[in-house]
From Swiss-Prot:
It comes from the Bacteria. Pfam families: DUF1292. NCBIfam families: PRK13678.1-2, PRK13678.1-4, PRK13678.2-2, PRK13678.2-4. Disulfide bonds: none annotated. This is UPF0473 protein YrzB. Belongs to the UPF0473 family. InterPro entries: UPF0473.
Length: 93
């Protein structure tokens, strides 16, 4: 996982792979982390899309960074606020 990447493959606890499209990535200085918001590509156009979020650490070579779960309610609040701002900006365009 790296900033600017468009698709990522998520592997669940059972080893199932799911191709997802990256909505956007951002860094947050308060938490000192990079974050990625993404959604499953297989979602139907008429279905409500579930947007997922993870923190990530890019590898030194810039490829295949590791995703981590969001750990605190404060992080979730910050991510939700960032997403709402992003979606509001998209609606204005």
């Amino acid at each position: 996982m790296e900033h600017g990447e468009k698709n990522i493959t998520i592997v669940d606890d059972q080893g199932n792979e799911q191709l997802c499209e990256v909505l956007f990535t951002f860094e947050n200085e308060e938490f000192g982390k990079s974050y990625v918001l993404y959604y499953p590509i297989e979602s139907k156009d008429d279905e409500e899309v579930e947007i997922l979020a993870s923190s990530f650490t890019p590898n030194e070579d810039g490829e295949n960074g590791e995703l981590f779960p969001i750990e605190t309610d404060e992080e979730w609040d910050m991510i939700e606020e960032t997403l709402n701002t992003f979606l509001a900006d998209e609606d204005e365009e």
